[in-house]
């Protein structure tokens, strides 16, 4: 199998996909302004090719394109692919778990030759629990992320409050996903979250103090610098032996709005 990654910093999808010729799966990461346009355009260029998409940053070399870029990942080769969606992500994604179970059977998925990639619109903790209830039985690896804007796409159709997923089976050999934490922990900085709002992804306090003030004191920065920290200095949530990156989206008063949910008593 072969993976192709292409990005256009100006949001020109035609340019980004110009070298893609025989995709078996397409992953779209667009910007908020052009997402619907890009979803339609991608389906028009590659009708019938399975695809999933979300709103998110696109990376070109060392440059992060967060506002108006577009990125596409194409997977080629002897692959069996099925894409689908779990709806009602914020309330009852388990209602649609039968779709995932059926799709696993469609591709004859197994631990060594199949992975799952997902793009979620939100409430990822609940969605992941739902997905793992199925994937865990077959030890199928999962990789993905939560996009912005509360919507995702599957095969040219846009869904709000949903999780888009793709099951990929490599018919020529094995396939596996890996993760890498590119951040280093700041020494002696561990906090207990409180006064959180799970529905709005807000952290009110860290160790009993206003979250904004604590964050600024650690980094010795002011209000103006807060907006530049999303990719530089994220918080990390302890999840067993793993650290889950929780990037800060924006400051809301003395609270921090994040890209992932944080609960009271979570260790950061």
Question: What feature does the model see in each segment?
Answer:
Residues 1-45, 49, 54-268:
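Small-residue-enriched flexible segments
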